[in-house]
């Protein structure tokens, strides 16, 4: 490799590449979440018949993974570059390899492997066929073909490509610690994020108010239900995300037992399923506006039979 791309140049390169493939460039969704998959730009849009092609960076919070800024590769918050394409292009893997070339990684000069790793997210009732992508022995990307989202079968199938930006940048810049990644010219990743990493880790493991979090979970769950009773999908899903993050904080604090853990996950999953069903019904009521006219008319006629 010649010039080593900065973190933000990696993002810009991926944005330009997937823009050229017809993806809309979305912005990170303004609610805490554990993965880019949980953004409504993936979770909601992966279900139903309408096409959807989008790419976005998603800061992803995982309280239990915090290490006070002392671990070079494990983080409370990391960044994913998320690509979702529905229906899935037949050449999605070739497009992915081409995107690596744009980053200066020649597939012919490196050991790139697709290792089977089927994906499941119990808290949202989602699952799919998947592969980890290993670059010279290090996982840098997760590939998934969604089979089920929010408890609903997907059709057409959505392809998801999730780049782990910190791992990718560490490889490209040849650094051993995420904190040594150059975010922009002259500015290191650690200069931006090491203090937040320490503080969020301390909060998640030592300081968070368990009683408050338990109460908040119940309140968020109730409010999601109220929004759904009014047919308000997006506010309801915001509260599902709040439930998920609150549970993750409780889990990091060790505030829930193994039995209770399963119960909380089931409560989140039940809400997510109702959100998914309500969203599909809403899109049908609106007449599937993202479908081309011929397909839209045909599908609405079939639904009316």
Swiss-Prot record:
Tetramer of two alpha and two beta subunits. InterPro entries: aa-tRNA-synth_II/BPL/LPL, Gly-tRNA-synth_heterodimer, Gly-tRNA_ligase_asu. Its main location: cytoplasm. Coiled coil: none annotated. The gene is glyQ. GO terms for biological process: glycyl-tRNA aminoacylation. NCBIfam families: glyQ, PRK09348.1. Transmembrane segments: none annotated. Keywords: Aminoacyl-tRNA synthetase, ATP-binding, Cytoplasm, Ligase, Nucleotide-binding, Protein biosynthesis. This is Glycine--tRNA ligase alpha subunit.
């Amino acid at each position: 490799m010649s010039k080593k791309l900065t973190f933000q140049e990696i993002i810009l390169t991926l944005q330009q590449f997937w823009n050229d493939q017809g993806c809309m460039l979305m912005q990170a969704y303004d609610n805490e979440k554990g993965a880019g998959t949980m953004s409504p730009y993936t979770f909601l849009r992966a279900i139903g018949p309408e096409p959807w092609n989008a790419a976005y960076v998603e800061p992803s919070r995982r309280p239990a993974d915090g290490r006070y800024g002392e671990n070079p590769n494990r983080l409370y918050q990391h960044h994913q570059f998320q690509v979702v394409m529905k229906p899935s292009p037949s050449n999605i893997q070739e497009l992915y390899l081409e995107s690596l070339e744009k980053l200066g990684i020649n597939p012919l000069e490196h050991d790139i492997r697709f290792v089977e790793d089927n994906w499941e997210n119990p808290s949202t009732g989602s699952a799919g066929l998947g592969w980890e992508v290993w670059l010279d022995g290090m996982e840098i990307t997760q590939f998934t073909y969604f089979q089920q989202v929010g408890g609903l079968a997907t059709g057409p199938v959505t392809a998801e490509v999730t780049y782990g930006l910190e791992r990718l940048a560490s490889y490209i810049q040849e650094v051993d610690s995420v904190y040594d990644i150059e975010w922009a010219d002259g500015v290191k990743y650690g200069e931006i994020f090491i203090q937040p990493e320490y503080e969020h880790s301390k909060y998640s493991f030592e300081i968070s108010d368990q009683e408050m979090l338990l109460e908040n979970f119940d309140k968020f769950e109730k409010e999601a239900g109220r929004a759904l009773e009014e047919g308000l999908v997006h506010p309801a899903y915001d509260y599902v995300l709040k439930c998920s993050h609150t549970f993750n904080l409780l889990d990091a604090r060790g505030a829930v037992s193994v039995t209770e853990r399963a119960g909380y996950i089931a409560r989140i999953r039940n809400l997510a399923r109702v959100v998914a069903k309500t969203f599909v019904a809403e899109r049908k009521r609106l007449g599937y506006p993202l479908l081309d006219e011929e397909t839209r008319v045909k599908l609405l006629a079939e639904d009316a039979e």
